[in-house]
Amino acid sequence: MQETPKANRLHIAIFGRRNAGKSSLINAISGQDIALVSNVAGTTTDPVYKTMELLPLGPIVLIDTAGLDDVGEIGELRIKKTKEVMDKTDLAILLFSAESTDYSLEKEWLAELTERKIPVIGVINKIDEAGSSFQSVDLEELFDVPFVKVSAKERLNIGRLKEAIQTHSPLDFERETIVGDLVKPKDIVILVAPQDIQAPKGRLILPQVQILRDLLDNDTLALTVKDTELEDMLSSLVRKPDLVITDSQVFHKVNAILPADVPLTSFSILMARYKGDLEMLVKGAKVINSLKPGDKVLIAEACTHHALQGDIGREKLPMWLNQKAGGALDIKIVAGVDFPEDLTGYKLVLHCGACMFNRKQLITRLIRAAEQNIPITNYGTAIAELNGILDRVTEKLL
């Protein structure tokens, strides 16, 4: 892996009307002609993502969206997709054209961004084309956000916009470390990574790579082994490991092998702590014990993938949950952005580790569940509860 994963980058979305210059602004910030620019209104349809480095801030994702004023049946669908972008937005740029005098839509969208607690920078574009009557101070008085005046086409004041992005970016868009606060230099940490058919050929899955890198950055003695070789690894060590991190699917096997005084957790639980609210997810996992046949359960995955035999979300978890409930549950499985607005009626929501989501996107889903009083947990905490070891695998983390 040579690049920072998209999920770990600050997500900056640009919202504005058609032909306000959103795509031109993307090109100006990135210094490349990567977004299609046209005088025809509605050139951008689906959201467009561009990863880049914005120094000194670091790796970011710029998101170009469809116009706020898109019309017709297709336009409504485009606006719906644009609103879905807000679920993953860490910082919003609300774009105004210096040629415009109607700001009613911008007020509506600012209200929604504010309600979602997304920091906003107002950008007035096309200042090179503005008439002598244009007064930016009037616009700035209407909107209580910081403003920058630019010409995306002529690349005017783009440096000032980058400075504003640096200044107003949220400091807490992600935790500084996944596991570094749990270990110290020279600690022995064993990663148990069973290589099944779901793993990409010749590669580890993303959470394993990220956690291994974090352990190396924190000067630990990181050892990676398959579950079938764990006992051999333990017997070869001169002292007990300080921490064992395993794939949740082999919790039962690893728990049986490890001495009780060796701390144990999983990749999924660490990612839940890194991106979400682990205490909420642990509380949600306890609900598994009260599920009854016929109860509605939602299983949500962050990414869409071709499910193979033994898929954790589509086969194993439903089977284990049905066994625990003593009969068939009413289980619905969704993937990608297909997460219901209305969760009422569900007894429990189970979410994957969300390695392909940024923190904002996962937190948005947790908040949605909390606002509707629906318990939510993730795969790792759920599997730990099903195996009766949830307290053990979270005791160092809460």
Locations of the language-model features?
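Conserved G1/Walker A P-loop phosphate-binding module
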Residues: 1-76, 80, 84-87
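C-terminal effector/interaction modules appended to NTPase cores
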Residues: 2, 17-23, 202-209, 213-398
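Conserved hydrophobic helix-helix packing surfaces used for dimerization/oligomerization
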Residues: 12, 189, 295-297
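Conserved C-terminal guanine-recognition region of P-loop GTPase G domains, centered on the G4
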Residues: 50-58, 77-147, 177-181, 204-220, ...
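G-domain G4 guanine-recognition motif of GTPases
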Residues: 65, 96-99, 118-134, 148-156, ...
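Canonical P-loop GTPase G-domain recognition
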Residues: 118-121, 126-181, 190, 219-222, ...
